[in-house]
């Protein structure tokens, strides 16, 4: 009877999903939006036949003065269709369009006729009625500071008027003009470096200071006998090592450094967004900053830090002396190290990559190779080629790591470390690298096709190719990539909470199957990133259902962690606090994520700040918080000393509070309609107060990481010395010295069942007793 009811409920749910009102898919976008004539049909390259004329603007502006100007589009070559001979303004089909915005300088522009002009993503564009003209009137209000120079960018397109039912036209040619208007007191300025060059110089200076610091520490050991030859003999073993522990330390330090670099990038564009109509960064600088921020935090920050834990801890947990292929492991590290300069090197040209971390074509494919020399300026920035090359090298590094860890777990487990007695962190790494290894080919193929388009002039993703193909390739990798970084975080939290609760993890087998389930389902949900790109309703419903299924294994893990805490005796340490913080923030991020599989809601949330809030709650509140927890937990094993608990407590209290205060308001911004990846916004939008709050708390969260940096440095020298096992852990890494020797085990250990050997918490009350009886079971005499 119960089974029949369950079947009926399931069928009713599926029927309701398929019956849900859906937006109609169009080949080029979302139904009614895409079918607005003349709005989405622009070609990939500008046309010299289209002339964009701007008249009425002053050569120099007076502070706060308002000027009237006109934008006119002309194309004498284009043959008009339909009612194209009708007097301008009374036609019923598209005739022309524009896009105008202030790139820098802080001026404002507005349309004279509100029926013809609308605000669009920080600038102005035409309405449907405005699409019937080729001339529009505007007002330019100068900034209050007449020492500035205002930069205007005006796009104009001429349309021949033959749009059909599907939208668009067969004749649509555009061009653009860029205009500089200095204030009357702007004067001439000396040469100055761009914000990007200043930033990368600061990063290089930081690297230099780190090197000088290492040199100083070595010098202080013995000033009388110091020579550079001896310093090199100290440094060389680290640069040429194949020991999994030293490679792991370098992975983590590399990732932590770029985690700070990526955070600094975020703070710089939070300054830009703190105030409406701000010009702290230009459009191009902003685009490059958030491109490098996303790429740095994910590929150069989070993944290397996770790889550091993988390299150091996994062989110790399974009782292996090293990884299966130590030289390949070291090679993967150095491929990662040399990919970073490639990703950032475009900054020295003054044009860092501006294609975002998702690298969507056709813009990312456009270059001199397929546009020609005269039009090459309309393609992606010069730094894009080196950026894409760096991404390809990252793919090679990750592939080598995947092979290594999979082979190690299969072949090098110590006696007693059976599949169902492996630590959950080892399981999480195994599942994570399997997902990485299976998903990487799609990314590597897409990246190389993108590189060929950009350098050889091929047409995989530009005219004659299919830009949506890249989206499929990227997200087939990109969504499993989310789980590649979060599943090891699950493993870290499982280790920390079980040890802190003084009991084994509740529901061990279900935790293993839940992580494996996430690993499988993670490959069949990528389409939810593309619900607004045009998709068959059947596949849209299928991706909606599979995305919702992810909540089942994830929810099982949350309840198992809570049951572990309930059934244990919790000891509150800094690593425990960060894991508890993970439970709160990751759960909130998961709840906000359940809005996106609903296609009707995704229309409104897609590319809004609601997505930014969700992603950061999962990525920082999930992955980074777990990494902090793992750092406080395993730091004693690496150094033989504990991190300072007082500094750790302040790090948690300030960081956790500021993090939530910074990212929670982003949900409200998304609901209000603020688009992501926007350079600025108007005062009238109502976004200013939330953005100011977000920026302030983002700075507090960023500055709180300096407590962690100081704690790592201070505790390495003056931290409390510890023995093998300061926390009471049970897995094999706690059976060797702190730090472990090289090789990690002189004799391969045998893992025993601690519950069977020591009656592990045999007298502790069971979960059932706590829930229903309220009293522990009576001790037997």
Identify the function of each model-found stretch.
Residues 188-204, 217-781:
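Membrane-embedded and interfacial regions of multi-pass energy-transducing membrane proteins
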Residues 202-212:
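Core hydrophobic alpha-helical transmembrane segments of single-pass membrane proteins
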Residues 65, 139-146, 556, 560, ...:
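Short, solvent-exposed linear motifs at loop/edge-of-secondary-structure regions
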Residues 134, 139-170, 398-414, 710-722:
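Ser/Thr/Pro-rich, low-complexity mucin-like regions
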Residues 2-6, 14-139, 148-204:
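Sequence context surrounding c-type heme c attachment/ligation sites in exported
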Residues 15-19, 210-215:
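Hydrophobic alpha-helical membrane-insertion segments, chiefly the h-region
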